[in-house]
Amino acid sequence: MKKIISLVFMFISCIGIYAQQIMDATAAYKKANDLLERLTIEEKALMVRGYNKFFIKGFEEKGILPIYLSDATQGVNIRNNLPDPNVVKQLERSTAFPSPILLASTFSPDLSYQYAKAIGEECRAGGIEVLLGPGLNIYRQSQCARNFEYFGEDPYLVSQMVSQYVTGLQSTGTAACLKHFCGNNTEFYRKRSNSIISERAMNEIYLRGFKAGIDAGAMSVMTSYNQIDGEWAGQSSYVIKNILREKLGFKWLVMSDWNSVWNLEKVIKSGQNLEMPGSYNFGESVLGLYHQKKITEKDLDDMVRPILATCIAMGFYDRSKYDLSLLDKYQEHEKIARQVAEEGIVLLKNRDNILPLDPTKNRKILLTGKFIYEIPRGYGAAEVIGYNNVSLIEALQRAFGRTVYYIEKPTVADIKEADIVLLSMGTRDKEAIERPFALPKEDESLMRYVTKNNPNTIAILNTGSAIDMSAWNDRLAGLIYGWYGGQSGFEALTDIITGKVTPSGKLPMTIEKTFEDSPAWGYLPKGASLYNELKNEHLINVYDVNYGESVLVGYRWYDTKNIEPLYPFGYGLSYTTFTLIKPRLSSKKMNDQMIRCSVTITNTGSQKGAEVIQLYLKENQPSVSRPEKELKRFKKIFLNSGENQTVEFEITPEDLAFWDDETHDWKVNSGQYSILLGTSSRHISHILSFTKE
């Protein structure tokens, strides 16, 4: 029997490697001051605006090289449309990794490290110094069509995945950019929204992932499009100076999102460093403010200095732009992408163990729906085309031969004659829009039509958020959430369908029964159409997004309000079975020291597989309204049939804390607490109690 200790912060073991690669802030700022003295006021004005759409301006004769910034979290978006394409030699190809929400479904910070490291290596090969990711906005509501770029609804899960992402990416010498800071949880006219978030919710939910990324050493942050309490985030001194720099301790480069700021004087004095992508007259406007004495040269120095210090600390000015040796690692990157897909695809339903399907059986397997030949992906800045893309029908026919056959528009007879129907559905989610909590109308019609006529229907859903499944979920025999699996996603999916791989993915968010159940229900302005027309965005009045649910985001809302979800946070099935036994606490009293919680997990089924042990905490008699439970630890365990392991978690007083709006600080109450151990937010096996003295 093995014993595993789950560390409080899983990135700690990697910080030593990271710290050896990046210069200390004091030394970097000293060198930055030396460079700053070489720049004229005109050069400083040019340096605080973007150049060539995705670059930081360089002055090579002064030892300052142009720096390339490129999207995004799920791989390198190869940009062949730069105003001046000769500034950089673009990669010929880049790996299309699974979407970050699929990565979050693995519940594996180690995979997050490997995933980001592989992306960083492709950045280094392509001369990209700063990757514009990870995106880590909290999944607040299911209609946000950018949820696929993020890591789900729980701040602890987000923090663990992001800290390892940052560490993995920056181990390659590529700078991470945490985005979008902050309160950017809807894409509905995002340049016209004003997020109203309580101090407590901001600290307990929306800042925690950013804090984890900063603590892991992230070297840049991108501000968001929206307003925070009535001021645009990218020009808000409160957001940048007070929260990001003073409260979270961020020392490095801050950039605006593209075309997201409006008042130049506020931008310059807010703590912002870099206006992107750089309006054509920005430099002249800066100099105009300077000559009008509305800003000083010190104001510009304060903007430029963190840009220089960040580039110096990362070694951007002292190294070869391209590391072409890393072009040999694409095959390794493909393997990582496939492993992530294998571990992140979620099996939600498996009636009568219809899955896995044995390829040696002579059955008629009808394939219909969408994404048959097309690779599903999210669109916008994060889009990655990939290479060696394998379609769904290609992957399935490799495994099953011609027993899998495709009919675009099957008749009732076609559907009834099939032994199994594989029904592929999904959405094409995209930055800058919201999408309905539903399949497209034609897909919904086909789903109802097929499930009505064949009880052995297995649905494959490729999407970036939850969707309404109320009309047909009960009629399905099987349901697989495939997300956006990247270039190898359908190969991984096929391995799960055949049983070559046992599914182990877990939902990083809740799938509600109806959108009306969501804590964000009613977030759109009264009378607004979901289908926003971006060309008219400037005509839309600024509207408030009131985060009235406060800290009750995701499962915190459903559990506390006793609303039954369709599928709960942390849920996902396997082809084998597990039991949790022998839960123990090292002490039933906590003072100022940690206590340990251990539990033994056994694979009681016939297949090897993996389970995610989830540890939630609850204050039994809180002094303020608190969630029914909060995720504090998790660990993914791989076991052969019959094997068992004992897992030990460390719980600290800090894990009991909530944000006190009166003292504006974290507070820990004395009293009774419960530890809940289980395999989802709604599947709790054991409850243990202890007293905080």
Give each language-model segment a name.
Residues M1-A25:
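Bacterial Sec-dependent N-terminal signal peptides
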Residues K3-I4, C123, T646, E693:
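Intrinsic disorder/low-complexity segments enriched in polar/small residues
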Residues A19-F658, D665-R682:
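Glycoside hydrolase catalytic-domain context in secreted enzymes
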Residues H683-E693:
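Short beta-strand elements
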